[in-house]
Swiss-Prot record:
The name this protein goes by in its record: NADH-ubiquinone oxidoreductase chain 1
PROSITE patterns xref list: COMPLEX1_ND1_1 (PS00667), COMPLEX1_ND1_2 (PS00668)
Cysteine pairs bridged by disulfides in the record: none
Functional summary from the UniProt entry: Core subunit of the mitochondrial membrane respiratory chain NADH dehydrogenase (Complex I) which catalyzes electron transfer from NADH through the respiratory chain, using ubiquinone as an electron acceptor. Essential for the catalytic activity and assembly of complex I.
Similarity comment text for this entry: Belongs to the complex I subunit 1 family.
Quaternary structure note: Core subunit of respiratory chain NADH dehydrogenase (Complex I) which is composed of 45 different subunits.
Location of the protein in the cell: Mitochondrion inner membrane
Chief location bin: mitochondrion
Source species of the chain: Danio rerio
Catalytic activity: a ubiquinone + NADH + 5 H(+)(in) = a ubiquinol + NAD(+) + 4 H(+)(out)
EC number: 7.1.1.2
PANTHER family xrefs: NADH DEHYDROGENASE SUBUNIT 1, NADH-UBIQUINONE OXIDOREDUCTASE CHAIN 1
GO biological process, one term: aerobic respiration
Database matches in InterPro entries: NADH_UbQ_OxRdtase_su1/FPO (IPR001694), NADH_UbQ_OxRdtase_su1_CS (IPR018086)
């Protein structure tokens, strides 16, 4: 009974709760960083130096009345944000930090499959809101997410060819001597830009184009359901940055001190997250045709050529005698 309780309740909670706390502080860091980049203070009233601002925001959102538009689809309208958060939490299961909740042989494929399902929560929320702005935002989000998943999948395939396995733990072994960032630097740059687009972050935040769509697919949401979407979005940002760290920045595993690996991953993830915020502060929003041009006419041909190169080169050199 205790084993079942530990494996089915305590272990997942021990993973999910720190992620949600990290999300709360990421929102605060974002507001502070953007504030200082725009030569202002950011939140500085709640708690010492504004540290409790995200707690106050969370309490405020969850005690408000969740208002539902009268013409909205009642079941789907409330199910979509819950589905978004559940999928965002499930994505953390195969992450080696240093030990995963689910030790999967195909951990990378699991992450790709579940992140693809997140499209349904966005599409469901946009359609169920019965608002033209929400629907346009949802359709943009779906087109953008599906487009950039193509390049993400091909980049992952190249990285898998280098590491020799679909488990995330094999990447730790592969990168004991050299980070994959060095041999795969063109793919790493494209991966980073694709993760920005995949998580709908600036400069690819066309789904939330305030100037034309008010707030995008979540325009009709308020209170708790809006907070769930918010948590899911920022959890996905942290997840993508953790994934980038494991793939390209060598989360070195030392069996004697696994805590060092957790600290290493957390530090690199935090630095990548601040790079996300820096991008938001620095670049204006892309036009929609530029967004699609970038993936289908630039990233897709380059990633396809590099995948074929990484497959062909080992096969071509396989017949050579061992070099002593």
């Amino acid at each position: 009974m205790l084993d079942i309780l530990t494996s089915h309740l305590i272990n997942p909670l021990a993973y999910a709760v720190p992620v949600l706390i990290a999300v709360a502080f990421l929102t605060l860091v974002e507001r502070k960083v953007l504030g200082y980049m725009q030569l202002r203070k950011g939140p500085n009233v709640m708690g010492p130096r504004g540290l409790l601002q995200s707690v106050a925001d969370g309490v405020k959102l969850f005690i408000k009345e969740p208002i539902r538009p009268s013409m909205a689809s009642p079941i789907l309208f409330l199910t979509a944000p819950v589905l978004a958060l559940i999928l965002a939490m499930m994505l953390w299961a195969p992450m080696p930090m240093p030990y995963p909740v689910l030790d999967l042989n195909l951990g990378i494929l699991f992450i790709m499959a579940i992140s693809s399902l997140a499209v349904y929560s966005i599409l469901g929320s946009g359609w169920a809101s019965n608002s033209k702005y929400a629907l346009i935002g949802a359709l943009r989000a779906v087109a953008q997410t599906i487009s950039y998943e193509v390049s993400l999948g091909l980049i992952l395939l190249s990285a898998v060819i280098f590491s020799g396995g679909y488990t995330l733990q094999t990447f730790n072994t592969t990168q004991e001597d050299t980070w994959l960032l060095l041999p795969l630097w063109p793919l790493a740059i494209m991966w980073f830009i694709s993760t920005l687009a995949e998580t709908n972050r600036a400069p690819f935040d066309l789904t939330e184009g305030e100037s034309e769509l008010v707030s995008g697919f979540n325009v009709e949401y308020a209170a708790g359901p809006f907070a769930l979407f918010f948590l899911a979005e920022y959890s996905n940002i942290l997840l993508m940055n953790t994934h980038s760290t494991v793939l390209f920045l060598g989360a070195s595993f030392t069996p004697d001190a696994p805590e060092l690996m957790t600290i290493s991953i957390a530090t690199k993830t935090a630095m990548l997250s601040i790079l996300f915020l820096w991008m938001r502060a620095s670049y204006p929003r892309f036009r929609y045709d530029q967004l699609m041009h970038l993936i289908w006419k630039n990233f897709l041909p380059i990633t396809l050529v590099l995948v074929l190169w990484h497959i062909a080169l080992p096969i071509a050199l396989a017949g050579l005698p061992p070099q002593t």
